[in-house]
Amino acid sequence: GFIALGLRIPGHGTVPAGLVNMAWETWLAATRLAVREARAQAPGPLPLHLVGFSNGGALAVKYALDALEDKTGTLARPDRLVLISPMIGVTRFARFAGLKAVPALLPAFANAAWLGIMPEFNPFKYNSFPVNGARQSYRLTHAIQQQVRQLATSGELAAFPPALTFQSVMDYTVSTRSIIAD
């Protein structure tokens, strides 16, 4: 059998407002805790598979990259990744998302902290999205891309676990090119 552990990422996957004051490093810390718990329930040498959708896919990749660099053996190395529309790259304009929120420092312009505010009826993704969510998404993807380049240069990327990736041609949130190239 399998032991499956679902992770509720802090500030993500509950209500869009949870992303207003969140940092991607907190998401990664929660990912590490979840993998540690999964390993406690199914200790090695049982295989460890990480499955992630969108932001969860990016966090699975970041965790796997960190595990490659971990010389202490603290981080369990995943045997395989299954990535569903992983957020490996986002639009280059996401880098500047934080600038849009600057007027929100004034109470009269609080809505500037959001890229859009709409009714929430889609169970698979937010319709409303805070600017900080876009900024943290960019920061996470940028960290992944830098780490991939560094590990490729050192030759350590060759030990990256096999990854099965699914990407929708209708997904406008993540970059398909980044999944292939980065």
Short names for language-model regions:
Residues 2-16:
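Conserved alpha/beta-hydrolase
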Residues 14-47:
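Catalytic nucleophile-loop/oxyanion-hole region of alpha/beta-hydrolase
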Residues 50-52, 84, 166:
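Short beta-strand immediately N-terminal to the catalytic nucleophile in serine-hydrolase-like folds
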Residues 51-60:
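Gly/Ala-rich beta-loop-alpha elbow adjacent to hydrolase catalytic centers
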Residues 62-66:
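Active-site signature of alpha/beta-hydrolase-fold catalytic machinery across serine-
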Residues 81-95:
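Active-site nucleophile loop of the alpha/beta-hydrolase fold
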Residues 91-121, 154:
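Short, flexible helix-coil linker/hinge segments at the edges of structured domains or between repeats
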Residues 125-182:
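Serine-hydrolase catalytic core
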